[in-house]
Regions:
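Membrane-interface loop-to-helix entry segments
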Residues: 24-31, 35, 39-48, 173-180, ...
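Selective recognition of specific alpha-helical transmembrane segments in multi-pass small-molecule
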Residues: 109-117, 203-218, 229-249, 282, ...
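Extracellular/periplasmic helix-exit of transmembrane alpha-helices
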Residues: 115-125, 129, 239-257, 265-272, ...
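Helix-loop-helix module between adjacent transmembrane segments
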Residues: 32-33, 106-131, 138, 142-174, ...
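Alpha-helical membrane segments and immediately flanking helix-loop junctions
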Residues: 59-94, 120-138, 142-144, 155-161, ...
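N-terminal alpha-helical transmembrane segments of multi-pass membrane transport
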Residues: 1-82, 92-99, 110, 416, ...
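Flexible loop linkers connecting adjacent transmembrane helices
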Residues: 38-66, 90-100, 112-146, 343-363, ...
Length: 468
């Protein structure tokens, strides 16, 4: 049994992330960028104008659908999470300052990957028995590639459903409970026995909240995400900017460190001299993927419910999503840490303590502890919401609507389990399946790349179309 567990958490995890996902992200991102004429760069202004530029306009959705904004905030709910805070901190600690450069590179290519995922999701979605729009990799495989390729969609759903209990549930609940404990300990340190009871109470409360929202369907998830995601993101951005500009003299040197060590991690010497280039590249690319999920295909499930007639217009939200998540929020986390001048123990895995120390340079330790704890709590909560939808849709595709209800009940129970138990092995196995999701998704993306290119050409470049 131990050998099987080691295979899933070690060998298979390395193969999935290092030898499959990362090369597919680079090669696939470049290929899709070329086929679609680099619209994430050439039409970036148009994409922002028609996504973030419309955020505060009143939108209404038809039956069985959510507004485009609710769709993107539901997807962002799952992606803007602990990866933006803890993941970015780990990228720097384990890969050096230069890891931020590779995080950016993966995001620039990831914008086109997620654009393609969302575009295909709208193009090949369908109505379920309740009349709701459903879509994602399993549906663009089924309706785009035909019955001989259905095994690819089935594989995706199996991998995603298993991963939802780890990356989308237990790890996030652990973050919430840990954050609440940190916030309480900043004022009233709790004894071990009291902590266990508190964790159980927290788990029950979180499970109840998730249950109320989850059983309300995609519309309720979208309505909650639409309100929570922008608010929590804006507050985090504001406080990060205060720290960065509070150390304004370090902004230039911070960028200098990032670029100087992107290809030569040992350039600055000191504690970072033990970091190899491979570590810098791998941790930058991997943490970018953890943060924005481009290539995993998960966000396409949320976007499929959008009330829109244009696959390309919704696809633009995929570009915005990666930009907001990684280029903006992850970059601000990185600059907050580097500009603050806090000590970094390179080569050692870190949690939230690095970003907490950075915020403490401006706001003091007590406030910083509470703020980071609350930020992690909200980010993790919305991630659970997003992944509860992803897992539910995958189980629905495999077994039907009735069984998806059973999954939802199990998902809520696992929330309580995740609050009181440390299930590192289960989390590590789920992390492996999270990486495996990319395999069927990239098969479909490559096979249907011509469809995306055709839709993009018709929308942006055909002379008989309106000028965009």
């Amino acid at each position: 049994m131990e050998a099987v567990i080691n295979f899933f958490t070690g060998t298979l995890n390395t193969v999935a992330w290092l030898y499959i996902f990362l090369p597919c992200t680079i090669v696939g991102g470049l290929y899709l960028t070329i086929r679609n004429r680099g619209i994430q760069f050439t039409r970036f202004g148009y994409a922002m104008k028609n996504t973030v530029g419309k955020m505060f306009q009143k939108q209404e959705a038809g039956a069985g659908a959510v507004t485009p904004l609710q769709a993107v905030t539901t997807a962002l709910a799952a992606t803007v999470g602990t990866g933006n805070i803890v993941g970015t901190s780990q990228a720097i600690a384990l890969g050096g300052y230069g890891a931020v450069f590779w995080l950016w590179l993966a995001a620039l290519l990831g914008m086109m990957i997620k654009y393609s995922e969302v575009t295909l999701s709208i193009r090949y979605r369908e109505r379920d028995a309740k009349g709701d729009w459903v879509g994602g990799p399993m549906y663009y495989v089924k309706n785009g590639l035909g019955k001989h390729w259905q095994w690819v969609g089935v594989l995706f759903c199996v991998f995603a459903a298993i991963a939802s209990f780890g990356i989308g549930n237990m790890s996030q609940v652990n973050s919430i409970v840990g954050s609440l404990n940190d916030a309480i300990d900043a004022f009233i340190p709790a004894a071990e026995g009291e902590r266990k009871l508190l964790n159980f109470v927290f788990g029950v409360v979180i499970a109840a909240l998730i249950g109320v929202i989850l059983f309300g369907g995609i519309k309720r998830i979208g309505a909650v995400a639409e309100k929570l995601v922008p608010v929590m993101s804006i507050f985090y951005i504001i406080f990060a900017l205060v720290v960065i500009f509070g150390h304004v003299g370090n902004i230039g040197p911070a960028f200098g460190k990032i670029f100087a060590t992107a290809f030569t991690p040992k350039a600055l010497g000191g504690a970072a001299s033990g970091i190899a280039l491979k570590q810098t590249i791998v941790w930058g690319l991997r943490r970018s993927a953890f943060s924005n999920e481009a290539g995993l295909g998960s966000a396409a499930i949320a976007h499929a419910a959008a009330d829109t007639k244009s696959p390309v217009q919704q696809g633009l939200y995929g570009i915005f999503e990666v930009f907001a998540d990684t280029i903006v929020i992850c970059t601000l986390t990185a600059l907050t840490i580097i500009c603050s001048g806090v000590d970094i123990t390179f080569g050692q895995k870190v949690g939230s303590e690095l970003i907490t120390a950075a915020f403490a340079t401006m706001f003091g330790q007590k406030f910083a502890s509470v703020f980071v704890a609350l930020a992690l709590m909200l980010f993790a909560f919305t991630t659970i919401l997003g992944w509860s939808l992803y897992g539910s849709r995958c189980v629905q595709y495999l077994f039907g609507l009735k069984v998806s209800k059973v999954y939802q009940v199990l998902f809520i129970i696992i929330v309580v389990v995740g609050a009181v138990a440390s299930l590192d092995v289960v989390w590590d196995i789920a992390d492996t399946f999270n990486g495996l999701m990319a395999i069927p998704n990239f098969i479909a993306l490559f096979a249907l790349s011509g469809v995306v290119a055709k839709l993009t050409k018709e929308y942006f470049f055909d002379k008989n179309k309106l000028t965009k």
